[in-house]
Every structure is written in structure tokens, then in C-alpha cells.
């Protein structure tokens, strides 16, 4: 949670003028032009080894179609398509990504008309893909299923329940023995226990982990009536006269008054409140929020200066000890507290809320965060809370800019990360219920392909720690071409195609990320003016490899539904030459040893 400005508070007052304005029947992801014919889906976001996969089509394609089951470009099995619903038993090996493809002969040419990724993993933190929920009004079972089915199609395996709680210092409404059926959240929206529980049950059915959201060190203005001791609070003066707070205006019910996370009394109090949550709702864990760097020096009740971030590591460790079977994720706002605290604590993965953005550093901010997190955490994965088209969303209702979203998603994915994007709507602001921007049908189709691609090739994009140590597998690769296109080693440059190399045990992976037509190089695309990248085909490229390969193939989420295409190649004098079938936003070349 960033320090929300008064400008946004005034904006929220206009947008959220009634307690239940954001409802699932206004969901921009599900309806309208976003219908996709021949959409291939699975019954779960992820599967345990040994589980069968149920596949389904929303409409049957005409003519003869072949189902092909693949792993990293190799065909495991293929069979004629005979039904709109069927099952497949993946291999038993753990932590593997697969792609199921539908092939059809179109005018004498093999075309992939649909595909879907499949993640087989016993532990979700190996390949985390975060989504969110933010509205808990009265909902039918079918409404809940519709939202979760959308998240399932993006293979979301962690769902964080934003703004579900009653009070920051008392998240469960009522008591463990008498929980409320209906309560109001921080902005006075009605939340229903049946909806929260329905979402938890539905998420579990789809193989998703559920995390309840709450700030780790905050309370509302009525904290004294709930036995919060003033000695547990954080102050802006040494005489404990002024409580530090996160100001929120109307329509929010209260400012958030901040507590001292070092204080054992506060820790014990909040742990007891969390135990109440777990006794009523079978959440799988807690997504802990923070507020980043405080704008002024803060003190404890005795007048001692508080270093807020230095409490994060021990706080997380204590929470894990108290509830060892529950998962923990903690937000690092602008990386505050990540190094030496959060990253090395018992969190499932590193979660960074990204606020730094510029045309100068651009997409390189993502690569720096992801590699830093890997170093600081001994190889944990990274999820980025990166709010795209931010200023565009503040202007009011509108549409996401598809090229900007794709280019940010491609950069994060190529570097082994993922962006928190999908919920009842796509995310554009740190106040998660804000649904000002709508996905176009084009963007929804693209995001499905990109999430499928990230899952199908997860073993190449998010591999296990290399023998040489964390981040030792990345390398610079110089790509040349006899075409008019210019390639450069990462970071991105305008009018060029950036390259990233990665040495894996049995192959080298070369990523090509196109900025040929880029309006700018700012990942946020805050005003929504990033230009689309044109699709170009048959680009000859050459680059150095350490030895003659055994096989070379290419895949991109922008062409042939992400399916791998084996290509012809020539090797001479340490140089590999091949023709890349297509480049639009992101293409991956795999050179098998």
C-alpha cells in the first residue's frame, strides 16, 4: 500500500459514492467483446502430481482437429479431438509446465487454433501467479464461480482477498464464536461472510491458495474500544502526543493509526485476532501489507526512534512459528524492508510493490528488482504489484492500453517474474476495488496467451537455482541480423530489439523483446500512450553459442498461440544462424545442447 494522496482520496469519494457500486455484474473482464470462440480451459489453476486434468472447449471448431500434448516443445502425445470435454493424465514428474494445443489444417498449412498451459506442481510457491479479489457484496454461487473461472483461466494460484476485513486491528467482524454475517469495510461497503467463504471454497476447488489481506501495523480510530493499548502505537513526537497515521478522508471510515511492530503487546494482540480469523475462515495464509518509508521520524511510547523495517523479519518469523501451517507473503513497498528482512524471512515468495518508473530506467527496473530479490532471498520467486496505466485510470472510466500492458508483462515474464494483474477486473491502482479501466477483448485474448505461455514454459522462465549460484545463469548475448532490425543487449533501447541470454542445464534461452515502435520505455505506460509493436516474420539472426546444438526451437505468445516451432539452423565457427518465424513483443529462442 503506497501512501495514498489526498488527490486520490477526493477521486475515490467521487467514484465510490455508494457502498456497493463495484459489483460482479459490472465485471469488465467477463462480458461483451471478450468472448473467445474455441477457448480451451482447464478445471484447475494448478495440479498436484498424479492428478488428472479436465480440459474443455467453450465451442467446438469445425472440421478435423488434432489435440497435441507438449512439454518444452516436444510432443508427448496427440489424438483427434472428439469432444468438447475430456481428461488427460500428465506425467508424474513434479514442477513441470505443459501446453495442450489444438492443431488444424488450414489451406494446407498447420495452424494452432487454441492452446492452454498446465502447471503440475506440489508446491505453489515454486511458480507463483497472484490474483486478487476486492468486492464481497451479496453474491450467488454462479456469480462467485464466474469470477473464479476467469482467474482460473489465467492459472492464478494465489488469490489475495483485498479489503475483505472489518477493521485493521480487528479483521474478523464479531467474534470467533459469533462472527457477523454482514459487516462494512474501510469504505463502508457491505461484506458478506457467505461471499468470503464462497470464494475461499471455490478457490480451493480450483487449486488456488487463499491469502487474507491486512496491514501488519495499523488500527482504526476506535482502537481504544477494542483494547488496543496506546503504548503499542507509533508517534511522530517523543512525548507520545501525536499518533502517526495514514490519512484517509471521506468516504473512508477512519484514518489508519499506526502501531509499533517491534512491540510485543501489539504482536500478541494481532496474533490473537488472526487466530480468530483462521477459526472462522479457512484461509491458507496472510498477505501482510506495509506503508513503506514514513515521511517523518517516528517514535515508540517511550520516545525511542523506531526503525520500522527492522521489525519485519522477526515479525514474520514469529507469525510463522505461531501458525506453521499457514503461508505468509509480505509486501515490500518500493523494496522497503526487502533486503535483510522480508526476503530472508519465511515468506512464500518476494512481493514488491513497484513505484519507481521512468523513461530512463524503464523496463530495466523490473529486471533489477527480480534479480535483487533472488539474491536477497536465496532464489525465491518474485511477484510485482505494478499498477499499469496509472494516470489514465485516475482520469475516469476508460480502457487499458493493450501495448503498454503487453510490453510490461513480457519484460517481467522474460526475467522470471510475474505481475499481479487479474481479479474481478484488471488492476490499475493500489486501491484494488478501483475498476476505472476496462480490458478490451484484444487485451483479454493477449493476457490469456501470455499467462498460458508463462505456465507452459515455466521450467525455462523460472528454473531452479543454477549450480553456479543465484543469477549466475544470466548472460549478455549479441544478436546480429542481415535484416533492417537492430538488436542490443538488455536494457531496452528505442527502435531496437533487446536481448537476454540465460544458460540452463540442458539448453540456452535467448529472449528477444521488441521496442521497435515504442513511444517510450516506461513500464508503467501511465498515460496509456505506448504504441503497438508490429508483427514481423522470418527474421534471420546469428549469435554465438558454446557448442553445436542438438535442436533449436522458437516460441512466442504473439504467434501460433504460443506453440513451439522447431527451426532449421546452421552452426559454424561458434556462431548459430537461424530464421526466427515471428517477432512482435516477445520471442524466445531455445538452443538445446
Regions found by a protein language model. Give the residues of each.
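Bacterial Sec-dependent N-terminal signal peptides
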Residues: 15-36
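An acidic-aromatic substrate-binding cleft motif
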Residues: 113-167
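Active-site-adjacent "subsite" loops/lids of carbohydrate-active enzymes
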Residues: 122-128, 136-141, 212, 216-281
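Aromatic-lined carbohydrate-binding/catalytic grooves of carbohydrate-active enzymes
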Residues: 147-148, 152-194, 218-233, 259-262, ...
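Active-site neighborhood of glycoside hydrolase catalytic domains
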Residues: 262-349, 355-367
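Aromatic/acidic polysaccharide-binding cleft in carbohydrate-active enzymes
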Residues: 380-473
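Carbohydrate-binding surface patches
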Residues: 481-547, 587
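C-terminal beta-strand-rich structural cap/linker in extracellular carbohydrate-active enzymes
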Residues: 572-593
Amino acid at each position: 500500500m503506497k501512501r495514498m494522496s489526498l488527490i486520490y482520496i477526493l477521486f475515490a469519494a467521487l467514484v465510490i459514492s455508494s457502498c456497493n457500486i463495484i459489483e460482479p455484474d459490472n465485471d469488465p473482464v467477463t462480458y461483451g467483446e471478450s468472448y473467445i470462440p474455441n477457448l480451451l480451459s482447464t478445471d484447475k489453476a494448478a495440479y498436484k502430481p498424479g492428478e488428472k486434468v479436465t480440459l474443455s472447449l467453450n465451442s467446438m471448431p469445425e472440421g478435423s482437429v488434432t489435440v497435441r500434448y507438449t512439454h518444452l516443445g516436444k510432443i508427448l502425445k496427440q489424438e483427434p479431438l472428439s469432444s468438447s470435454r475430456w481428461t488427460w493424465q500428465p506425467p508424474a514428474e513434479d514442477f513441470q509446465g505443459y501446453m495442450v494445443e489444438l492443431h488444424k489444417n488450414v489451406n494446407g498449412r498447420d495452424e494452432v487454433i487454441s492452446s492452454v498451459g498446465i502447471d503440475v506442481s506440489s508446491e505453489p510457491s515454486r511458480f507463483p501467479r497472484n490474483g486478487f479479489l476486492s468486492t464481497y457484496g451479496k453474491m450467488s454461487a454462479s456469480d462467485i464461480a464466474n469470477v473464479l473461472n476467469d482467474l482460473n483461466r489465467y492459472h492464478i494460484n494465489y488469490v489475495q482477498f483485498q479489503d475483505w476485513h472489518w477493521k485493521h486491528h480487528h479483521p474478523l467482524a464479531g467474534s470467533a464464536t459469533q462472527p457477523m454475517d454482514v459487516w462494512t469495510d474501510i469504505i463502508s461497503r457491505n461484506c458478506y461472510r457467505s461471499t468470503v467463504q464462497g470464494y475461499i471454497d471455490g478457490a480451493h476447488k480450483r487449486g488456488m491458495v487463499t491469502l487474507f489481506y491486512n496491514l501488519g501495523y495499523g488500527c482504526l480510530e476506535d482502537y481504544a474500544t477494542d483494547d488496543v493499548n496506546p503504548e503499542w502505537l507509533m508517534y511522530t513526537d517523543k512525548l507520545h502526543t501525536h499518533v502517526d497515521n495514514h490519512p484517509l478522508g471521506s468516504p473512508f471510515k477512519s484514518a489508519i493509526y499506526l502501531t509499533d511492530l517491534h512491540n510485543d503487546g501489539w504482536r500478541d494482540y494481532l496474533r490473537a485476532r488472526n487466530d480468530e480469523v483462521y477459526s472462522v475462515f479457512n484461509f491458507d495464509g496472510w498477505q501482510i501489507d506495509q506503508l513503506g518509508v514514513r515521511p517523518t521520524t517516528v517514535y515508540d511510547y517511550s520516545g525511542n526512534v523506531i526503525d520500522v523495517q527492522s521489525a519485519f523479519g522477526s515479525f514474520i518469523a514469529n507469525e510463522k512459528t505461531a501458525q506453521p501451517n499457514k503461508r505468509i507473503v509480505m509486501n515490500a513497498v518500493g523494496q522497503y524492508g526487502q533486503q535483510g528482512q522480508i526476503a530472508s524471512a519465511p515468506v512464500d515468495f518476494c512481493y514488491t510493490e513497484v513505484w519507481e518508473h521512468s523513461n530512463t530506467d524503464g523496463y530495466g527496473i523490473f529486471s533489477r528488482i527480480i534479480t535483487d530479490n533472488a539474491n536477497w532471498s536465496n532464489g525465491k520467486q518474485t511477484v510485482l504489484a505494478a499498477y499499469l496505466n496509472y494516470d489514465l485510470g485516475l482520469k475516469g472510466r476508460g480502457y487499458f492500453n493493450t501495448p503498454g500492458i503487453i510490453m510490461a508483462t513480457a519484460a517481467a515474464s522474460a526475467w522470471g517474474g510475474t505481475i499481479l494483474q487479474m481479479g474481478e477486473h484488471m488492476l490499475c491502482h493500489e486501491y484494488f476495488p478501483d475498476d476505472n479501466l476496462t480490458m478490451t477483448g484484444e487485451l483479454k485474448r493477449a493476457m490469456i496467451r501470455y499467462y498460458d505461455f508463462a505456465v507452459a514454459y515455466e521450467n525455462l522462465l523460472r528454473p531452479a537455482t543454477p549450480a553456479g549460484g543465484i543469477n549466475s545463469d544470466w548472460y549478455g548475448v549479441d544478436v546480429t541480423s542481415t535484416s533492417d532490425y537492430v538488436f542490443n543487449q538488455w536494457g531496452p533501447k528505442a527502435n531496437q530489439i533487446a536481448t537476454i541470454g540465460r544458460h540452463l542445464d540442458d539448453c540456452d534461452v535467448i529472449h528477444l523483446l521488441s521496442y521497435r515502435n515504442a513511444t517510450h520505455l516506461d513500464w508503467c505506460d501511465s498515460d496509456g500512450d505506448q504504441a503497438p509493436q508490429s508483427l514481423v516474420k522470418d527474421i534471420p539472426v546469428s549469435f554465438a553459442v558454446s557448442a553445436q546444438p542438438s535442436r533449436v526451437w522458437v516460441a512466442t505468445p504473439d504467434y501460433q498461440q504460443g506453440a513451439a516451432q522447431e527451426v532449421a539452423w546452421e552452426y559454424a565457427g561458434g556462431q548459430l544462424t537461424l530464421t526466427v518465424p515471428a517477432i512482435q513483443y516477445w520471442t524466445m529462442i531455445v538452443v538445446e545442447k
